[in-house]
Amino acid sequence: RFIFGFEESYGYLAGPYVRDKDAVIGSMLICEMAAYYRSIGSSLKQRLEEIYAQYGRYLNKVDSFEFPGLSGMDKMSALMQGLRDKPLTEIAGHAIVKVTDYQKPEETGLPAANVLIYKLDNGETVVVRPSGTEPKIKIYYTTLGKNLEEAEAEKEKLAEALKPIMA
């Protein structure tokens, strides 16, 4: 059963009611949540802070590395192939416990794509993929801390460890 889905550019789907991502369904659900929490003397922000206190603070960030000029696409391709030929074993001191290579549809059950996902020993993830429209490689980080500052510091450690690879 599909519950919800969303994307980086703020498209949102909830349930089977709407078949294309838009802001209308997300706005409606936020209004319903706000009304509910107000009816019990709370607020969306207050409830969100309670969730953070219970589960920690997840952070999702993206870094982009540009590869301009005629040689940019070749550099990007070589970089992605290099990550496949000599797989990373750790990032910023965190062991990589699983690598999912989306160029292997037999592993994912999905169509082939030039995407690598690294699952770290602390539950964080790092996703590396070339942009489909620009001469860039994007790295997506999902980190967790007790608070936002911890999650941001963890993201920065991972980013610093990966910068030399993107040079």
What positions do the PLM features span?
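Phosphate-binding and adjacent anionic-ligand microenvironments
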Residues: 1-129, 136-138, 147-153, 159-167
